[in-house]
Amino acid sequence: MAARAPQKPLLRLRGLEASGLRIDQVSVHAGEAWGILGDTGSGLDVLSAILGGELARVRSGECLLPPDLGLVSFARQQALFEKELRQDDTDFLNRPDPGTPARDFVQNADSHTELIKLLRLEHVLDRGYRYLSSGESRKISILQELSKGLRVLVLEHPFDGLDQASCQELDQQLHLLHQKGLTLILLCSDPADLPSWCTHLALVRDGALRHSGPAGAIRPLLAESGDRTQALFQARVEDMRNKDGQTAPADASEPLVELHNGFARYGEVEVFKGLDLIIHPGDHTLITGPNGCGKSTLVQLISGDHPLCYSNDLTVFGHRRGSGETIWEIKRHLGIVSNDLHRNHRVGGSALAIVLSGLYDSIGLYHKPAAEERLLAERWLAWLGLSNKAARPFRRLSYGEQRLVLLGRGLIKKPRLLLLDEPTQGLDSANRKALLDFLERAAAEQLCTILYISHRLDEQRPFFRQHLQFSPNAAARPFRLTPSGLSV
């Protein structure tokens, strides 16, 4: 009886060198589910671009990719967002242009009702893309690829930006699709995000793909490797405390933020209403809730980046919004890191320039910085572990490195109020822990007041003094604020 010929791989990378990443050999066969782990800045984003066929300069080697391969990545989401901005007809319509309906990104949407319901997207399919939250737009990108009937699907950081329920449901759905024959490759920065049902695992570290093979043999090696991971983020509270910022010391008797009966909407779509929130100096506030409930919109109201900030009964740093104050009187006391800020950084500029721009509250650097300002920005890049990438264009950094640069931008001026909207998205577990440890020390020493949005249970640290929870059932109980005793 003749021996069976070995199964040909669907995908093979061998002897590759591209953008600082070396791949000796990895082969993916039909029906396998790969989990590939990589630290922030390790080259995981380069691997994503290779798998998506988006990297033009591959120096050598073999790159066998199937034609029916789909990719969901931060870079593709950014490209789609920028395309939507270019097509914005608001000025011609004399009304806000919501953008392409989400439904149009899904092939034969009516035949994917079960998946749409599972991802909880029924209510957003007819909404314009520009009116989607970051989590909703990520779900649409996943649905878009799943609706194509592909043989291979690559997901970069598949669970980042999704609420807890959506993470669990996506994990279950991907497992089911794998059992039905879909070949999966999941690129993750946190070992906790690697599904238990992965058949194969690999590690990207120090510019090379290592330790690839069956999950049972590789998982112990990943755990051992994770124990040795060093965070890039090395900022210390002492560094921030000893540097003079641009902001004035806080008056503990005056609320930083005071919102009464707050509301928000996009077009005709109501996001939330009836929200009361007061943040005094030291009232470090955690905000949680499902995708699309209005968490990021609340941050935009406070920062002045949502037009309805002038229609609300909202006071920020003692300024009643709409009373004649300038937005710069608000911005000068704020440090911001958010998905909205991240995707709107479309201008050219180096990592150093982006950090410096935090001193001027601008997207892009349009001032010649003083020597001491430049020195301070260089110090922040050193504390972020990115000194060697100071001159690199912001968009040529990995997504996680971009996030670290934006953290430096938000912290450089020692703000009175730090608005952090999912700041650890794209970061590995070591950098996530380092940032949270830093914030805990900053809170303890009263260097600033922190408002923090997160979907992750492991980010709910004890330094938060109040917890604003947005409910998935807004009609029954839209918000809950604890432990202050206030509720809505």
Which residues does each PLM region occupy?
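Conserved ABC ATPase signature
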Residues: G128-S133, K368-P369, P393-L397, E401
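Conserved structural motif at the start of ABC-family nucleotide-binding domains
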Residues: L11, S19-I23, V257, V271-G274
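Hydrophobic anchor residue at the start of the ABC signature
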Residues: S141-I142, L407
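ABC ATPase nucleotide-binding domain signature region
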Residues: G38, L44-D110, Q300-I363
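Conserved beta-strand-loop-alpha-helix hinge in the C-terminal portion
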Residues: A208-R236, R461-P462, F470-V488
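Catalytic Walker B motif of ABC-type/P-loop ATPase nucleotide-binding domains
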Residues: L153-H157, L418-E422
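Conserved ABC ATPase "signature" region
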Residues: D110-L125, L356, A371-K389
